Amino acid sequence: MPIGVPKVPYRIPGDEEATWVDLYNVMYRERTLFLGQEIRCEITNHITGLMVYLSIEDGISDIFLFINSPGGWLISGMAIFDTMQTVTPDIYTICLGIAASMASFILLGGEPTKRIAFPHARIMLHQPASAYYRARTPEFLLEVEELHKVREMITRVYAVRTGKPFWVVSEDMERDVFMSADEAKAYGLVDIVGDEMIDKHCDTDPVWFPEMFKDW
C-alpha cells in the first residue's frame, strides 16, 4: 500500500516528457485547491497563499476550491473567505462530503452561480463558538461582546449572500442545522447540485474546468 502523497505523470509546459510529480502539485498547476481538513492557521495560510499566487499568475482564469471539512477556527475561516473576495479570479466552491460550520461559510463565499454541492454532500451552519468558559470574569465579558459582534457580522453575510432575512438566518444559527445538497440550494447556500453542470461545461467550454479533468 503506498505511503505519502500519490505521484502522477505530468508534463510541465516546455518539457518534452512527462515526469512524476506530487498529485497536489499537479492540482495547484491546474488552479484546483482542496480544503479537506479542520480549518486551522496552517491550512489557512496554505490556501490563501495559493489563491494570491494564482491570482498574480493569472487574474482571469477561475480557481476551484473543493471542500470536505468539519469547520474549525473562526478567524482562520474568515481569512479564507476574505481572500476569496479580494483576489481577481472567480472562485468556484465545490462541496463533497461535508461543509460544516466555518466550512459552510467558505462554501457560501464562492462566486454567485459558481457554488456547487455534490448530490450526497451535507452542509451545516450554526453560530460561532468560543472558549470563554475557561476565562476569568473580565475576560469572559470582553469575549462575549466580541463574539456577539462577530456573530452579527457572519449572520449578515449569510443573509446577504443567501437572500434570506437577517432574522431567519439568526434563528437558524441558534442550533446546528444540517442540510442536504437540495436543501442547501433552496436555502441559497449553493447554486448547483450534482456534477451534471461540470460534465456539460467540460464538453462545451474548454476554459470552464481544469484541462486534466476532461479525460476522467
UniProtKB/Swiss-Prot annotation:
Component of the chloroplastic Clp protease core complex. Its main location: plastid. Its EC number is 3.4.21.92. It comes from Triticum aestivum. One of its GO terms (molecular function) is ATP-dependent peptidase activity. The gene is clpP. The lineage of its organism: Eukaryota, Viridiplantae, Streptophyta, Embryophyta, Tracheophyta. It catalyses: Hydrolysis of proteins to small peptides in the presence of ATP and magnesium. alpha-casein is the usual test substrate. In the absence of ATP, only oligopeptides shorter than five residues are hydrolyzed (such as succinyl-Leu-Tyr-|-NHMec, and Leu-Tyr-Leu-|-Tyr-Trp, in which cleavage of the -Tyr-|-Leu- and -Tyr-|-Trp bonds also occurs). GO terms for cellular component: chloroplast stroma. One of its GO terms (biological process) is proteolysis. This is ATP-dependent Clp protease proteolytic subunit.
